[in-house]
From Swiss-Prot:
Its EC number is 2.10.1.1. Pathway: Cofactor biosynthesis; molybdopterin biosynthesis. This is Molybdopterin molybdenumtransferase. Its cofactor is Mg(2+). Binds 1 Mg(2+) ion per subunit. Catalyzes the insertion of molybdate into adenylated molybdopterin with the concomitant release of AMP. SUPFAM superfamilies: MoeA C-terminal domain-like, MoeA N-terminal region -like, Molybdenum cofactor biosynthesis proteins. It catalyses: adenylyl-molybdopterin + molybdate = Mo-molybdopterin + AMP + H(+). GO terms for cellular component: cytoplasm; cytosol. It is an enzyme of class 2 (transferase). The keyword Magnesium applies. It comes from the Bacteria. Gene3D superfamilies: MoaB/Mog-like domain, MoeA, C-terminal, domain IV, Molybdopterin biosynthesis moea protein, domain 2, Molybdopterin biosynthesis moea protein, domain 3.
């Protein structure tokens, strides 16, 4: 059962722990060609079918030698050539060297490859101008990956760092966890679609676009259900429709004090819901629970609050549900602030900041300016969150603070 936290403010860490403890990763699997696997999560371990490299080969353009042939300190005649895809054929006469190119198989008996920059051409052959040690400039079979080794475990997110490795193993396709299906809608009579004229008291629905884009960035399958008016019957129908299609249902708006009475009644009828007041700023109103078939996350209506709670809570939830074993909790680091930061003790505060190097080369952070929960431009101006502890008050320039650099959801790395 969920605990009810409406009487107090729940710490972010507690909320995240409660959420993730309930989530079991999806088990449905798809087999896709590598070109369609970018951003997908491996469903099974990748075991190497072969050694990489598959044979001893040269790491340099140069000359393959036997170390004993160099003891007389005389030029060595060139007995032949070896290229990538065209190895040296035949016997290798004693007292000679073989011209070899990068990636070419080293001939049997080769003990070292001498780079061409450490040689001189003479009428009698090739003179070697530097000391030579056994094994130099030779890439050994299996040096990178051994046959039967687990290359990537299940739960790995496949990117341009992993997919070329699979191709190098001769693997053409991979088993991946199916995409998480997320149904998304906004609530409120005050919302209007961008491109349409605003009537008195209306605002444009930006939250749904924000969340849709972040869901796409995370590789989810998005079911966009539009704007749902403040009508209990239509809202109930929207939840039933969303629950029938999705693994996760996300709504924006309708979870703040004074807004959620009928929303809460509907959700408690359809599932098991905990409405939380989180001890964070912005983003205090947030809801999480379980409908008949799907998980539910209710985001605040203020744009910055909605984006922040998605980033801090929904992003890790989706990662675990999708089978991603890497931590989705944003990493933090300590830097000095160059700005005065206004803060009232009582809640964990996520202010938007600009992380950059100062004139002396040290990392420092400055504020983006006004930190209102409606100032969404602070995300485009900034590149990090400045994370101020719950008990902390105003911060003066030069004090140490924690920052979370934005990841790709907000244009970061």
């Amino acid at each position: 059962m969920f605990m009810e936290f409406s009487a107090g403010l729940m710490p972010l860490e507690t909320a995240l722990t409660q959420m993730l403890s309930r989530i079991t990763p999806l088990t449905a699997v798809e087999t896709l060609p590598l070109v369609n696997c970018f951003g997908r999560i491996l469903a099974t371990d990748i075991v190497s079918p072969l050694d990489v490299p598959g044979f001893d080969n040269s790491a340099m353009d140069g000359y393959a030698v036997r170390v004993a042939d160099l003891s007389a300190d005389k030029p060595l005649p060139v007995a032949g050539k070896a290229f990538a895809g065209q190895p040296y054929q035949g016997e290798w006469p004693a007292g000679t060297c073989i011209r070899i190119m990068t990636g070419a198989p080293v001939p049997a008996g080769c003990e070292a490859v001498v780079m061409q920059e450490q040689t001189e051409q003479t009428d009698d052959g090739v003179r070697f101008t530097a000391d030579v040690r056994c094994g130099q400039n030779i890439r050994r079979r299996g040096e990178d990956i051994r046959q039967d080794a687990v290359v990537f475990p299940a739960g790995t997110r496949l990117t341009t760092a992993e997919l070329p490795v699979l191709a190098s193993l001769g693997i053409a396709d991979a088993q991946v966890v199916r995409k998480v299906r997320v149904a998304l809608f906004s609530t409120g009579d005050e919302l209007q679609l961008p491109g349409q004229p605003l009537e008195a008291g209306q605002i444009y629905d930006t939250n749904r676009l924000t969340i849709h884009l972040m869901l796409q960035q995370l590789g989810c399958e998005v079911i966009n259900l539009g704007i749902i008016p403040d009508d209990p019957g239509k809202l109930r129908a929207a939840f039933i429709d969303a629950d029938s299609q999705a693994d996760v249902v996300i709504s924006s708006g309708g979870v703040s004090v004074g807004e959620a009475d009928y929303t809460k009644t509907i959700l408690e009828e359809l599932g098991e819901i905990a409405f939380w007041k989180l001890a964070i700023k912005p983003g205090k109103p947030f809801a999480f629970g379980k409908l008949s078939n799907s998980w539910f996350c209710g985001l605040p209506g203020n744009p910055v609050s909605a984006a922040l709670t998605f980033y801090q809570l929904v992003q890790p939830l989706l990662a675990k549900l999708g089978g991603n074993t890497a931590s989705a909790v944003p990493p933090r680091q300590r830097v000095r602030t160059a700005s005065r930061l206004k803060k009232t003790p009582g809640r964990l505060d996520f202010q938007r900041g600009i992380l950059q190097r100062s004139a002396n080369g040290e990392l420092e952070v400055t504020t983006t300016g006004h930190q209102g929960s409606h100032i969404f431009s602070s995300f485009s101006l900034g590149n990090c969150f400045i994370v101020l502890e719950r008990e902390r008050g105003n911060v003066e320039p030069g004090e140490w603070v924690e920052v979370e650099p934005f990841n790709a959801l907000f244009g970061g790395l």
